[in-house]
A protein has these predicted regions:
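N-terminal strand-loop element at the rim of the active site
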Residues: 6-14, 20-72
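Short His-centered aromatic/hydrophobic patch
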Residues: 95-100, 117-118
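Membrane-proximal helix-turn-helix segments that form the acceptor-binding/catalytic region
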Residues: 135-155
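Carbohydrate-associated surface elements
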Residues: 161, 182
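Nucleotide-activated donor-binding/catalytic signature segment of Leloir-type glycosyltransferases, i.e.
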Residues: 244-260
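Aromatic "clamp/platform" in nucleotide-sugar-dependent glycosyltransferases that forms part
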Residues: 261, 280
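Short hydrophobic beta-strand element within catalytic cores of glycosyltransferases
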Residues: 297-300, 310
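Conserved acidic donor-binding segment of nucleotide-sugar-dependent glycosyltransferases
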Residues: 312-313, 317-324, 333-338
């Protein structure tokens, strides 16, 4: 059974779906399944030239926007690369980016297409100051959801809250399947350790949407209250200089370590005590599940998929976004009470192990894929056609 996992970012990109898919591929490795990964190399720019036409809206209405123009050129480039590189048939294509799914439907019109929408690109741009709320760019990006609904055989997303977000932009929201990302519990796992001073950590791209400015302000309050801690910020991005300057201004720079980009955060994560990320928006928040599998106590904001992962006071703590006082109060609780911190981490690990392990997600995906693959339409795998009837 030939499956194509179609990504936008290369698989080596850290975080979210890009870090999940290579491990997903390992779990599908058998005589029954053959999975290929595909993405657009960063070097491919301005190669595609053909027109772009959508069925449910006219993108040219928004064509004066440079951001929209960039999206359309990316579509052209991805289509050009797909037509150049993909020659064999597939039994099913699973796309993980809106533009990718639309390209795959155009290039492979008769192949079943499953589309997962992992995040709201329009709100990321709004929160990061790239576009205005209510802008033509936001309207263009939200129009893509109905186009995806029209072109996909199954539309999926990663949290119930994000499905609710999609309601105004699609015709049949009740048909959207919710399946969280899965995480390799052999890669993200606890390591016994003892820290004399509580170790806080965040892992994210350094952009305004992640709320790290609020975290630094909360840490300044903790310091004023006399609490010792070390804050580890793993990641890089356009806000790094501003965040380092803010840390100096608040007097917490000496208590904060900016690591920059790291390819394998799981090598650091198990040795810390508390994971905190005060995001202003998250469709799911994959890094919370990863931290939970490493037995860290979770502190997050009551937004999007974070509040589906964390039950406040049970397996973590939730605070409102943009509230450094309540964030400091929550951190104070887990810093002051190691037993409470341990209990939150334990229940968080149990939930992540049960609901977000990659084994669970693989089983759900296999059931979903098989719905679209009648036996008489399965393309034989090389050298194993006679073994197709085997059950894993």
């Amino acid at each position: 059974m030939r499956l194509l996992q179609a990504l936008f970012f290369p698989p080596e990109q850290p975080g979210g779906v890009s870090s999940m898919i290579p491990h997903l591929q390992e779990r599908f490795g058998s005589a029954r399944w053959e999975m290929e990964l595909f993405s657009l190399p960063k070097r491919i720019r301005n190669k595609g030239k053909d027109d772009v036409v959508f069925e449910t809206f006219d993108w040219n209405i928004y064509g004066e926007s440079p951001i929209v123009q960039k999206y359309i050129q990316t579509y052209r480039d991805y289509r050009w690369w797909t037509q150049l590189r993909l020659k064999q048939p597939y039994d099913l294509i699973h796309s993980h980016h809106p533009l990718v799914g639309l390209v795959m439907r155009e290039v492979f019109p008769d192949t079943p297409l499953v589309q997962t929408i992992h995040s709201s690109y329009e709100w990321e741009l709004i929160l990061n100051g790239k576009i205005e709320e209510g802008s033509m760019e936001q309207e263009f990006l939200t129009c893509l959801y109905r186009e995806l609904e029209q072109k996909s055989d199954r539309l999926m997303t990663v949290s119930r809250s994000f499905r609710e977000y999609l309601v105004p932009y699609v015709d049949r929201p009740e048909d959207i399947v919710v399946l969280p990302n899965g995480f390799d519990d052999k890669r993200f796992k606890p390591v016994p350790h003892e820290n004399e001073v509580p170790q806080l950590m965040s892992v994210c791209r350094l952009v305004p949407a992640k709320g790290l400015d609020v975290l630094l302000k909360a840490c300044a309050l903790l310091k004023q209250r006399g609490h010792a801690y070390v804050l580890h910020i793993i990641g890089d991005g356009p806000s790094r200089t501003d965040l380092e300057q803010l840390a100096q201004h608040l007097g917490v720079y000496e208590d904060t370590i900016f690591y920059g980009y790291t390819l394998h955060p799981e090598e650091f994560m198990p040795f810390f005590d508390i994971f905190v990320l005060p995001s202003r928006a998250e469709a799911f928040g994959s890094v919370f599940a990863e931290a939970a599998l490493c037995w860290l106590a979770l502190v997050g904001t009551d937004v999007g998929g974070i509040s589906e992962q964390i039950e406040d006071g049970v397996n973590g703590l939730l605070v409102p976004p943009d509230d450094e006082v309540q964030l400091a109060d929550a951190l104070e609780k887990v810093i002051n009470d190691p037993s409470y911190r341990y209990e939150l981490a334990r229940t968080g690990w149990e939930k992540a192990k049960t609901q977000y392990s990659i084994g669970h997600v693989v089983n759900e995906l296999k059931k979903l894929y098989l719905e679209f693959l009648p036996q008489d339409h399965i393309h034989p795998l090389p050298n194993v056609a006679a073994r197709q009837s085997e059950v894993e």
